[in-house]
Amino acid sequence: MKKFLVVALMLVASAAFVYTGYAGESLKSGPQIGEKARPQPFFPLNINGPTPNEKQCLVCRNGDNPVAMIFAREPNENLVMLIKKLDAETVKNSEKKMGSFCVFCNDSEGLSTKLADLAKNESLKKFTLAIDNPTGPAPYNISKDADITVVLYTKSKVVANYTFKKGEFKAADVEKIVSDVSKIVK
């Protein structure tokens, strides 16, 4: 009986260890810190910016410049707040040729009109909104579980990556991301 109890406790302990390992893993989406930020060109439909209603490679357009790149499923209040603040940062850092854009991985009808209205209503100056397929560009590894993926990069290397599941993105996250723009515009 003693032997059985010891074996049972060991099994429970090892099961708990395995479970904690999986539960503690964070969601990965998009290029990770230290990786190449632009694994391959892709051509989303730009809604605003220099080439509205045209497909253009935004990572190509920005080259090695500092960039805030977002992949999102749909607009929400905190995402719009982030977009507005990153637009202001992009304007402020125009001498460093900072670029910023959000690619919506979504094919729902009416999204282009909704995003055009967003760009107009928020008076976006330098921030480009674009649409791509629901899975996102394949080499960028956008997780199907990620609602919002933010990648800050410069010289084509990722400096910061933030990934959020649906409902997890909060106002405090907006402030953290905006403060980390300083890492790419040094």
Regions found by a protein language model. Name each.
Residues N76-V91, S112-K114, L118:
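Typically the conserved alpha-helix immediately C-terminal to a functionally engaged Cys/Sec
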Residues Y19-P44:
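N-proximal helix/coil linker or "cap" segments that precede and/or mark the start of modular domains
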